[in-house]
Amino acid sequence: MTPLLELKDIRRSYPAGDEQVEVLKGISLNIYAGEMVAIVGASGSGKSTLMNILGCLDKATSGTYRVAGQDIATLDADALAQLRREHFGFIFQRYHLLPHLTVEQNVEVPAVYAGLERKQRLLRAQELLQRLGLEDRTEYYPAQLSGGQQQRVSIARALMNGGQVILADEPTGALDSHSGEEVMAILHQLRDRGHTVIIVTHDPQVAAQAERVIEIRDGEIVRNPPAIEKVNVAGGTEPVVNTVSGWRQFVSGFNEALTMAWRALAANKMRTLLTMLGIIIGIASVVSIVVVGDAAKQMVLADIRSIGTNTIDVYPGKDFGDDDPQYQQALKYDDLIAIQKQPWVASATPAVSQNLRLRYNNVDVAASANGVSGDYFNVYGMTFSEGNTFNQEQLNGRAQVVVLDSNTRRQLFPHKADVVGEVILVGNMPARVIGVAEEKQSMFGSSKVLRVWLPYSTMSGRVMGQSWLNSITVRVKEGFDSAEAEQQLTRLLSLRHGKKDFFTWNMDGVLKTVEKTTRTLQLFLTLVAVISLVVGGIGVMNIMLVSVTERTREIGIRMAVGARASDVLQQFLIEAVLVCLVGGALGITLSLLIAFTLQLFLPGWEIGFSPLALLLAFLCSTATGILFGWLPARNAARLDPVDALARE
């Protein structure tokens, strides 16, 4: 008869300083299907090491071990995990149940790694628990069970994927005599069903119940009676689970890993919440700075645009400070007419200015008098608190009318409710007040100079007696490139004058400078927020490393029941990503609250959350989880199952 498990000259040694300590010394052993074998020996004799090799948790240093004719030395880690999953079931002295899972969920774990569908797993687990008398304890947690009940759950878990070979390590060692007898009775039933049962024990009474007792001493077998040949094995072994394959198995495995990750996080709610806190603050900082910063930028740019940033000023001469007399009369009224006809011009206004005295009754103040057209106020986005601007008739007739700014009104008419219709002296010319203009506040501060505006025809003909213009201001239509407009304006006037005796000043440059400055500031603030996100990510990595250390035994249990290294890696990586995603969602919610709160106090701000900002937040959360969860997950996947199971 061909042995199910065949060991030939198995040796296992471990490094101890500069030396190698040999624990198993040339073990040769055959175990046949359906046998109930006890391996006995004193502590330190090597029986546990032998069991680990039999269960494919460990590999021999030398020698040959075959399972159903397959040499395990040729198998990689994943193939060994599959072998454990499909052929072996472990029963541990301390039960090794996962405390955050219910009885039913503990029993299902091996089938999860086998890829069995949820419904089939549930039915199989319920069937096994019913057979072992635990049908009324399926929703209990291990801490709510007695030792005997926990060991029966461990047996059910060992049988979940079929359990062709049952490896029981001191199965009664932590139980009272009655519970121990119940467990041994169950093991006898399994033997009768065709399972191969291998018991590792130091208790002679337990060993005596086996058909064959193998004694090991100092790493060598000192007693190995021949196997009792079995003609017929009653019942046959448990049915091996049928797994799904391909894409469905991948999706099912991922869903189960996600579920297990969620359960693990829920088991330590406070620690999970504190871990999330760093991510919440980081994501909220990034999103808030991006969104609120963009709203602030748009608010600033809107304010700048409202004071005439899409304007081009034309001055005579070569550059600022050029007072060469030959350029003084370069700009004419005909130039203004030609400019106004261009398709890209929204409005254009001339300017003729001089500093004059203003007088009303006994009030005498200095002011800057500016001759402009009626479009001037539209060009600079100015509004009227009283009256209105000049009309064409007043421009054509050189009417003696004037518009005051709010500061001039306050100086000349401190106690009057309505000043429209009042007459003041502008220089020596009487002028009737037709309006009060409200100037937009500039971010660069306001001038202390009082300002009044007259029709440019009045200013040129009646006040100054000149026929040329000091400057022309052009407002470019929305949507038209300001730089292109400046080039066309330069070409137009150069052709008209036959030379370039003027220069331009494009206020769009100010806008671009402000935009660049706000972008730089926003980038700086975003980097600060990203640093907080990185700190949060480091917190996640730290907690996950602690979690791996705390859950080392759990990792060993999962590997013993068939989890591959990739399964462990996936689970811990999903846990890290899940922490970051939930933290990210809460961070986005917090940033929404911050934005809405700001909008209550700053109603002029238009704060909006673009899908791109939310997508970036989601991607940041995922990337943080993957980046900072990789190291802990990799450490977990690299654990040796034997060492992991031995950890307290």
UniProtKB/Swiss-Prot annotation:
UniProt-listed SUPFAM superfamilies: P-loop containing nucleoside triphosphate hydrolases
InterPro entries: AAA+_ATPase, ABC3_permease_C, ABC_transporter-like_ATP-bd, ABC_transporter-like_CS, MacB-like_ATP-bd, MacB_PCD, Macrolide_Exporter_MacB, P-loop_NTPase
One Pfam match: MacB_PCD
Transmembrane among keywords: yes
One of the record's GO cellular component terms: plasma membrane
BP GO annotations: response to antibiotic
Localization annotation: Cell inner membrane
Entry similarity comment: Belongs to the ABC transporter superfamily. Macrolide exporter (TC 3.A.1.122) family.
Name used for this protein in its record: Macrolide export ATP-binding/permease protein MacB
Species of origin: Shigella flexneri
